[in-house]
Curated annotation (Swiss-Prot):
Intervals holding CXXCXGXG motif repeats: 151-158, 168-175, 194-201, 210-217
UniProt name for this protein: Chaperone protein DnaJ
Taxonomic source organism: Limosilactobacillus reuteri (strain DSM 20016)
Homology family: Belongs to the DnaJ family.
Gene assigned in the entry: dnaJ
Entry's localization field: Cytoplasm
Molecular function GO labels: ATP binding; heat shock protein binding; unfolded protein binding; zinc ion binding
NCBIfam families: DnaJ_bact, PRK10767.1, PRK14276.1
Length: 383
């Protein structure tokens, strides 16, 4: 099933301004907030709205989404490019569901975050080193990294199978301890997070705690994941793998994994985006007379025609011989710069040929030390 477009989810056009996106998000979040809308599917709709807003409200993530979409350049679900950033899917205004809700409907100030509300897990980052050619053409590889995963025994509840958390006896489920003290200005009421339940309003009896996670609801694990690196990635780019980060809380989704690519430089090629640059030495004769020479490209050797009279530092473009574009639309180009090399020493025949060339060109090359044979030839020619 195809992923719904983020712009469609928020009901805005692709050229919508940040204000338009924020306005649409507020309107839809208020409509589908779980505390307001109890219809089937409303909570799932609310999650999609938050996911769409999280991407479109961030200029870097939005730019990457516009180019690659939510599925990423290779079309695999849940992969895409974007800047690394922490945060939670439900905290776009600095708080949880209740913070957002209070901004829509007032309430006399900032409300306390609901400790039982679903919260997205922490995002993780993984640095992947790639050989130059693997970055150009892509590869499939397996990575291993540490993450907090939902406990499979208790499915995140923290309690043994058949057991459930109970209402905190200290705060009676409120999650906070309320105290009133007298001041010169009158009675002042304060609230502090309940130390017994850490603000959740629920506790698990020691004897009821899950034997696997000991009541945490998640376990630390070494996770193995197959990653398809798309052709055309570059050094410093990042790819997001959705829901491959730390486990969420209270039924919230897992965080994302951001893979940062580190590409090893090539000894033969220089790269700028999808363009490849190479140097090719040619001789004076090849430059003057023209020739056809072999040139290295990332796609293999190709023949390059050198026109007669080519000057040193001349640049030739080989269309389509560069790096594949990330969007899958063809390849970049390769630029070949030729360098005419002057020989450091000449054998006898080469020297004679060069002197003859100079003479035929009407050049009197100063500083050329003549051999005995040259002097005899000059003597006979003078007679």
């Amino acid at each position: 099933m195809a992923e719904q477009d983020y712009y469609d989810i928020l009901g805005v056009s692709k050229d919508a301004s940040e204000k338009d996106i924020k306005r649409a998000y507020r309107r839809l979040a208020a409509k589908y907030h779980p505390d307001v809308n109890h219809e089937p599917g409303a909570e799932e709709k609310f999650k999609k709205i938050n996911e769409a807003y999280e991407t479109l409200s961030d200029s870097q993530k939005r730019a990457q989404y516009d180019q690659f979409g939510s599925a990423g350049p290779q079309g695999a679900g849940g992969q895409g490019f974007g800047g690394f950033g922490g945060g939670q899917a439900y905290s776009n205004f600095g708080g949880g569901f209740d913070d957002i809700f209070s901004q829509f409907f007032g309430g006399g100030g900032r409300t306390r975050r609901d400790p039982t509300a679903p919260r997205q897990g922490r995002d993780l980052q993984y640095a992947m080193t790639l050989d130059f050619m693997d970055a150009v053409f892509g590869k499939t590889t397996t990575i291993k990294y540490d993450r907090d995963a939902e406990c499979k025994t208790c499915h995140g509840t923290g309690a043994k199978p058949g057991k459930s958390p109970i209402t905190c006896p200290r705060c009676h489920g409120a999650g906070v301890i309320t105290s009133v003290r007298q001041t010169p200005l009158g009675n002042m009421q304060t609230q502090t997070t309940c130390p017994e339940c850490n603000g959740t309003g629920k506790i698990i009896k020691p004897e009821d705690r899950c034997d696997t996670c000991h009541g945490a609801g998640h376990v630390h694990e070494r996770h193995e994941l197959e990653v398809k690196v798309p052709a055309g990635v570059d050094d410093g780019q990042q790819m997001r793998l959705q829901h491959q980060g730390d486990a969420g809380e209270n039924g919230g989704p897992a965080g994302d994994l951001y893979i940062v690519f580190r590409v090893t430089p090539s000894r033969e090629f220089r790269r700028d985006g999808s363009t490849i640059y190479v140097d090719r030495d040619i001789s004076f004769a090849q430059a003057a007379l023209g020739d056809e020479v072999k040139v290295k490209t990332v796609h293999g050797d190709v023949n390059l025609k050198i026109p007669a009279g080519t000057q040193s530092e001349t640049n030739f473009r080989l269309r389509g011989k560069g790096v594949p574009h990330l969007n899958g639309n063809g390849n970049g180009d390769e630029h070949v710069t030729v360098h005419v090399k002057t020989p450091k020493s000449l054998n006898k025949r080469q020297r004679e040929a060069m002197l003859a060339f100079a003479a035929a060109s009407g050049e009197d090359v100063k500083g050329v030390k003549k051999t005995v044979l040259d002097k005899l030839r000059d003597a006979f020619e003078d007679k």
